């Protein structure tokens, strides 16, 4: 992956994709890249000791942020600017700051509109423009055409490297050649990559949880904070992992296909009935929560016919790693 991406810029933000910011900064240093990208200005301090190169701040510059203003003067930091007025303002506050200028895409999140691009050349003497940044949506339909259209508009205003998010390496390389012309050199392109780089190969990792306790329980008995009535004879398996680890934390579904909508409807109906499938696998099957997860542990119901796990066993648990906080990372 690292070798295929032109000008790879690893993205290290938020919870570090489950691994932590400092660990991914060190991994990036080991990859030999010259630049990484963090999400916010405050994340710079968590990675700069582990990574010796340049650090891009993805969140647009805010004049009201003391940290952002201070870092704009740091020669190792490249600040993203998404408004024309902020380009003028940052150039007044800081002597020739290093900036990436964001172009508004169909995501409609941040960026200069096409009719603002002609304001950039008037500020060039007061800025060090490291490139144009184009953050594309995830959908493949129309992605390449949008990238080409915006890139051409940006390059017409100021020739500079193009930094892309969510553009496959092969498309980025093809676009660089296309923009360079039949006889010209490819336009310099850099690819930011986060989820695909750190979480792309699911076979390279496993998330496990420890069995903390096991209790027999009979139908009609109550258990848990909410004193839920047990639906049948079975076992209460107390598993490590709760809301503080990301258990039970789920992003809203996009539900773009009929299958996804059907799953969302079924899940909602079960939730309304007080039933929620847990991410824990016991004896080869995901099992039901007895009640919503606690902060550090979860109560799982296992039917009596099943053999219960032993205290201390480690069992698979499915986690959304972008919202997870794990207790330990073991490298094998």
Question: Where are the regions a protein language model picked out?
Answer:
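Active-site anion/phosphate-binding pocket segments in diverse small-molecule metabolic enzymes
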Residues: 10, 97, 145-332
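Active-site-proximal beta-alpha core segment in soluble small-molecule metabolic enzymes
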Residues: 6-157, 161
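N-terminal basic/disordered segments at the start of proteins
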Residues: 1-2
């Amino acid at each position: 992956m690292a070798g295929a991406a032109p000008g790879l810029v690893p993205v290290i933000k938020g919870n570090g994709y489950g691994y932590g910011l400092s660990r991914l900064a060190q991994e990036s240093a080991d990859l030999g890249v010259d630049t990484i990208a963090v999400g916010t200005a405050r994340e710079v301090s968590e990675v700069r000791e582990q990574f010796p190169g340049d650090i891009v701040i993805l969140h647009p510059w805010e004049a009201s942020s003391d940290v952002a203003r201070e870092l704009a003067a740091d020669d190792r930091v490249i600040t993203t600017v998404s408004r024309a007025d902020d380009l003028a303002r940052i150039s007044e506050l800081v002597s020739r700051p290093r900036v990436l200028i964001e172009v508004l895409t169909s995501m409609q999140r941040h960026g200069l509109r096409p009719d603002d691009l002609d304001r950039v050349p008037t500020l060039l003497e007061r800025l060090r423009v490291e490139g144009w940044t184009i953050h594309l949506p995830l959908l493949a339909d129309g992605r390449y055409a949008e990238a080409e259209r915006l890139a051409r508009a940006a390059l017409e205003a100021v020739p500079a490297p193009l930094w892309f998010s969510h553009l496959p390496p092969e498309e980025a390389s093809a676009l660089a050649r296309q923009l360079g012309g039949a006889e010209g050199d490819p336009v310099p392109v850099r690819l930011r990559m986060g989820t695909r780089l750190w979480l792309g190969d699911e076979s390279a990792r496993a998330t496990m949880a420890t069995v903390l306790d096991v209790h027999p329980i009979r139908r009609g008995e109550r258990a848990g904070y909410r004193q839920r009535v047990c639906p049948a004879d079975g076992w209460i398996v107390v598993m490590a992992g709760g809301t503080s680890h990301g258990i039970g934390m789920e992003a809203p579904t996009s539900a773009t296909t009929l299958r996804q909508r059907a799953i969302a409807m079924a899940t909602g109906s079960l939730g309304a009935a007080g039933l929620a499938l847990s991410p824990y696998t016991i004896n080869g099957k995901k099992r039901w929560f007895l009640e919503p997860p606690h902060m550090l542990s979860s109560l799982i119901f296992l039917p009596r016919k099943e053999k219960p796990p032993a205290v201390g066993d480690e069992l698979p648990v499915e986690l959304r790693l972008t919202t997870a906080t794990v207790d330990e990372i073991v490298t094998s």
